Amino acid sequence: MNIEKIMQDLERKHPGEAEYLQAVEEVLESIKDVYEEHPEFEAANIIERIVEPDRILTFKVQWVDDNGKVHVNLGYRIQFNGAIGPYKGGLRFHPSVNLSILKFLGFEQIFKNSLTTLPMGGGKGGSDFNPKGKSDAEVMRFCQAFMLELWRLIGPQTDVPAGDIGVGGREIGYLYGMYKKLAREHTGVLTGKGANWGGSKMRPEATGFGAVYFAQEMLNTKGDSLKGKTVAISGFGNVAWGAVTKATELGAKVVTISGPDGYIYDADGISGDKIKYMLELRASNNDVVKPYTFEFPGAKFVEGKRPWEVKVDVAIPCATQNEMGKEDAENLLKNGVICVAEGANMPSTPEAIAAFHNAKILFAPGKAVNAGGVATSGLEMSQNSMKYGWSAEEVDAKLHVIMRDIHQQCVENGTDETGYVDYVKGANIAGFVKVAYSMLDQGVA
């Protein structure tokens, strides 16, 4: 496999799409040896087929604000690869949304979904609409206008969107209500639904819970556990909240959360009422964490910085892509970090990942660590198809088993001759091989 040539061709076809190209190159570097051991992959041109989406759908979304002013946003749905099941991936509403970010997320989703062992292909979508600062009525009108364009493209056996940044329970509700009106059917076409109307228990916290389960499995390979460890977590949304909750439950002390304005350092640990307050912070719609220190004066707010300068044993970045750079990685290593588990999608830059690998610490990528969210979405799809619901305890138990299985796949495919586990390589190989063989079985279609 000539990775340099493949990347040159992709850069020519997709100029300026840095996030997408970064994600593709990481996967290609990981799977190179396995790919070359299977000439049937090359004969079927699997690489060129898998790095290009099946289709990209772009549409305008017209909506009216509370003052009667008409706005126009861009909407997207990328159906990347459906070899192992219906396209599956979230919708992101954020001003930063563009094709490069959605293609990177959709590409990662292929392998993440493959790792769960559930029958789900990879997709992603969203809009540059910003729900922050909007009234409920404005968000509802936007969601209805968005679904007016999207509904013909999706279906429970075709493409099943979910939430992501900017798309929580409120937005999923408005989207589903409009879909139901247009399609005149009550089906599992979206996941992340309310528990009263087809949703799964445990969905909001599933990504964070799964990330912590994965970190625990990583530490177990060294005869260690999260009990008694100090943990730095970035972000303060659903993923961070779930991670803080589960890490605390397993005996760790979480000392940081963060937002766009800076980070909170709480030496006493974020637990109990402090975890509940995280939900109030998010519900305030202000996207800041500084008010935490007003509620809990013993905590410290560090403006404009990320939490990776704090001395901790474990780091779980749960905010956004490329939030952890080389300097951040070096700070963590200098302060004795032993495990980094990516709760967000691609939060570490290539330079940061190289630093962790060179130091031979435990490091695992988002496509494995945060797969608990989409795994629980898959469990929601299963419940919808059966017209049946599991308890929170049943869903949590199934999630734990799935995360343990994903970890095992990474270990089996990523362990080198010295016994070091390259979780990036292991996750990429395990996810890729399943999809590649499925594509071979189905021919060129």
Per-segment meaning from a language model:
Residues 1, 15-22, 26, 41, ...:
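Conserved active-site and cofactor/substrate-binding residues in soluble primary-metabolism enzymes
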Residues 2-23, 218, 333-445:
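Adenosine-phosphate binding glycine-rich loop
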Residues 21, 37-44, 117, 154-163, ...:
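Flexible, glycine/charged-enriched surface loops at secondary-structure junctions
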Residues 40-71:
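Structured beta-strand/loop patches that form or line metal/cofactor-binding pockets in enzymes
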Residues 94, 113-227:
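Glycine/serine-rich phosphate-binding loop and adjoining beta1-alpha1 elements at the start
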Residues 191-194, 199-311:
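Glycine-rich phosphate/diphosphate-binding loop of Rossmann-like nucleotide-binding domains
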Residues 262-363, 368:
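Rossmann-like adenosine-cofactor binding region
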